[in-house]
Amino acid sequence: MSEREEFKFNTVEEAIEDIRQGKMVIVVDDPDRENEGDLVMAAEKVTPEAINFMAKYGRGLICLSLTPERCEQLDLHPMTPMNTDPKGTYFCVSIDAHPKHGTTTGISAYDRALTIKLAISPDAKPSDFVRPGHVFPLKARPGGVLERAGHTEASVDLARLAGLYPAGVICEIMKDDGTMARVPDLMEFAKKHNLKIITIADLIKYRLRRETLVEKVASAHLPTPWGVFKIHAYRHKLTGEEQVALTMGEWKEDEPVLVRVHSECLTGDVFRSFRCDCRPQLEKALEMIAKEGKGVLVYILGHEGRGIGIANKIKAYELQEKGYDTVEANEKLGYPPDLRDYGIGAQILRDLGVRKMKLMTNNPRKIVALEGFGLEVVERVPIKIEPNPYNKIYLQVKKDKLGHMF
């Protein structure tokens, strides 16, 4: 039985109404992600009493979620030039309102509420703040939870959906013993304090029913060694980022479709490097789609080196030649083993009419990620590739350290 079935969550509509009224709600993320609940409220409605409640009962770090545009306007720089947070949380340098605005130490509930209110004031300038401080700004992704299923994005989305300034105040909820509160504890907490409680998964579904972040800008036929596919060009409505997908055949919306979500790999896909198994997986997926007569391959640009980029990927190759494995090399460079997000890929699949998938993957994380965006994986279809002398260790590390299933 899932948590959704076992526990009674509120509707997103109920949460939006409470946010509009200036109340807090609890937002819970996926059990396979952080598996925690945050107190969330609109920054526009923050008060010293609300900050005090978060500090007293939430006990976590009180943060201010802002849009990328607002972070730029206030000249809020990343806390570190190299973000190694496995979840990709974008912390900016902490701030306090300048003492000229009436703050003292910056840490009091009054001072923090004042800092937050000032940060969303239309007249605020970078010079209105001192750094470091006691309020921790977080930069949300432009597409909100449809791009990243995090509390940062959820808080901004809820404020925007409530018709308020798109910024949120969030605080993790811990138990009395200092450990993180999980869903059963959060349900008790919500009941005790009369708070609504929702999941990020439900917020994603709510938005998916009403909006999309991608638009198809062109389609054409693409002859390949495996048959004639259709290639579709997509553009992110907010960032302008471009992506492509290949399709063959047609399907009904309730029909499970053979799908491959493939991460960009210049060295493997284009230069046929033996260091990885990317090109063989790409070609095998196209072959399997052609054999089936229908299916989709989404090719995610920007996923080079599991999200670290081509230059860092080649730096990782250098380290591998010195004895580091692929995971150790990423960590030596200051990156988590895998930085990829699949929200845009999920949006493209939905636009192509896919709701149920037979997903061609060896990566269990990809299954969890795509299901988090409202798609159903009815079957995992393994892609079996014979190792070569150059990628044998690489494949073993993916199996042992990243949980890939071969």
UniProtKB/Swiss-Prot annotation:
Binding sites annotated in the UniProt record for Zn(2+): 265, 276, 278
Q: Where does Mg(2+) 2 bind?
A: 34, 151
Its domain of life reads: Bacteria
Q: Which residues form the active site?
A: 338, 340
According to the record, the segments passing through the membrane are: none
Kindly list the positions annotated as binding D-ribulose 5-phosphate: 33-34, 38, 148-152, 172
Job of this protein: Catalyzes the conversion of D-ribulose 5-phosphate to formate and 3,4-dihydroxy-2-butanone 4-phosphate. Catalyzes the conversion of GTP to 2,5-diamino-6-ribosylamino-4(3H)-pyrimidinone 5'-phosphate (DARP), formate and pyrophosphate.
The protein's name is Riboflavin biosynthesis protein RibBA
Organism of this sequence = Aquifex aeolicus (strain VF5)
The coding gene here is ribBA
